[in-house]
């Protein structure tokens, strides 16, 4: 029986509609809309497209945008000065530096410069430390989106064997901690893991986040597993057209998995939605609409 398709796009639309209604209810109480600043450096087309998507989502929800664009020839000090100004700007609830930065730009100083309470990407060491300690805080958007999707679909996590393939600070490491906090038994695999197929075949939940097209084949998945594909890869088809694919051989794996996310339309929309959710969480805390995360 083919897998259930985990439709992140549909869930994201429902969550964003709920958030839009909440924003309209909060604005009269607070006296201002929530504010998000997305900072982009350079002319990378993919980054530009991602930023446009985030700004359109903000517009739909009634979130004010305070984004800035810097050229690759600009000074890193200018970016840091801008972050300092946004930290102090009471209209701004969330700050995000769009990654990756151009060659020669160190991403660490700007990530450290963001006020942890406005760190809606969840990448400041304080927020990562809170995650490690199991304390409330702003969480990384893609891992949070994966968890919300699993929970919304009623997929059990506690007591399950989960394998996360990919150890990045953006996805693999924080998602492993979130699954562990949800009482899964977690294995974090990576490019140096010997016999990856043996590891993934033992899993009830497999998350692919390595950026290698169709790495996970059908023979690497046990029947009835849940497969989450975080990968986004552009490949050229035999006709010369460009195609967007994930880290999973989707057509083959969906025939034996219990549930699977497509690419596109799976995890990607949830990432943007969790960015918006983090921005609203910061807005509520800073506006005293709630007292904790």
Swiss-Prot record:
Residues reported to bind NADP(+): 166-168, 191, 232
This protein's UniProt keywords: Amino-acid biosynthesis, Histidine biosynthesis, Hydrolase, Methionine biosynthesis, Multifunctional enzyme, NADP, One-carbon metabolism, Oxidoreductase, Purine biosynthesis
GO molecular function: methenyltetrahydrofolate cyclohydrolase activity; methylenetetrahydrofolate dehydrogenase (NADP+) activity
GO biological process, one term: purine nucleotide biosynthetic process
Keyword Oxidoreductase (UniProt): yes
CC annotations in GO: cytosol
Keyword match Oxidoreductase: yes
PROSITE patterns assigned to the protein according to its UniProt record, in alphabetical order: THF_DHG_CYH_2 (PS00767)
Top-rank lineage group of the source organism: Bacteria
A Pfam family recorded for this sequence: THF_DHG_CYH
Enzyme nomenclature, EC number: 1.5.1.5, 3.5.4.9
Cystine connections: none
Reaction equations catalysed: (6R)-5,10-methylene-5,6,7,8-tetrahydrofolate + NADP(+) = (6R)-5,10-methenyltetrahydrofolate + NADPH; (6R)-5,10-methenyltetrahydrofolate + H2O = (6R)-10-formyltetrahydrofolate + H(+)
Pathway terms, separated by semicolons: One-carbon metabolism; tetrahydrofolate interconversion
Record InterPro entries: Aminoacid_DH-like_N_sf, NAD(P)-bd_dom_sf, THF_DH/CycHdrlase, THF_DH/CycHdrlase_cat_dom, THF_DH/CycHdrlase_CS, THF_DH/CycHdrlase_NAD-bd_dom
Reported function: Catalyzes the oxidation of 5,10-methylenetetrahydrofolate to 5,10-methenyltetrahydrofolate and then the hydrolysis of 5,10-methenyltetrahydrofolate to 10-formyltetrahydrofolate.
Family classification: Belongs to the tetrahydrofolate dehydrogenase/cyclohydrolase family.
Subunit structure: Homodimer.
Full protein name: Bifunctional protein FolD
GN (gene name): folD
């Amino acid at each position: 029986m083919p897998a259930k398709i985990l439709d992140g796009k549909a869930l994201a639309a429902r969550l964003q509609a709920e958030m839009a209604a909440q924003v309209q209810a909060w604005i009269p109480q607070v006296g201002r809309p929530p504010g998000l600043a997305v900072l982009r450096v350079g002319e990378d087309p993919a980054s530009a497209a991602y930023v446009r998507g985030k700004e359109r989502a903000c517009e739909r929800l009634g979130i004010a945008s305070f984004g800035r664009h810097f050229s690759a020839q600009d000074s890193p000090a200018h970016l840091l000065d801008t972050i300092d100004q946004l930290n102090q700007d009471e209209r701004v609830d969330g700050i995000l530096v769009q990654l990756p930065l151009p060659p020669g730009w160190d991403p660490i100083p700007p990530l450290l410069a963001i006020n942890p309470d406005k760190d809606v990407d969840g990448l400041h060491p304080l927020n990562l430390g809170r995650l490690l300690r199991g304390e409330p805080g702003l969480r990384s958007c893609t891992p949070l989106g994966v968890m919300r999707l699993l929970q919304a679909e009623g997929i059990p996590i506690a007591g399950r064997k989960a394998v996360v393939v990919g150890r990045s600070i953006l996805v693999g490491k924080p998602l492993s901690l979130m699954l562990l906090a949800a009482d899964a038994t977690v294995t974090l695999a990576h490019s140096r893991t010997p016999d990856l197929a043996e590891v993934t075949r033992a899993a009830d939940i497999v998350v692919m986040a390595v950026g290698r097209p169709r790495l996970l084949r059908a023979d690497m998945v046990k029947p009835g597993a849940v497969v989450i594909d975080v990968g986004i890869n552009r490949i050229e088809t035999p006709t010369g057209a460009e195609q967007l694919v994930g880290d999973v051989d989707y057509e083959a794996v969906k025939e034996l998995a219990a549930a699977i996310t497509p690419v596109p339309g799976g995890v990607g929309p949830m990432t943007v939605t969790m960015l918006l959710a983090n921005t609203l969480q910061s807005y509520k805390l800073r506006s005293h609409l709630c007292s904790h995360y």
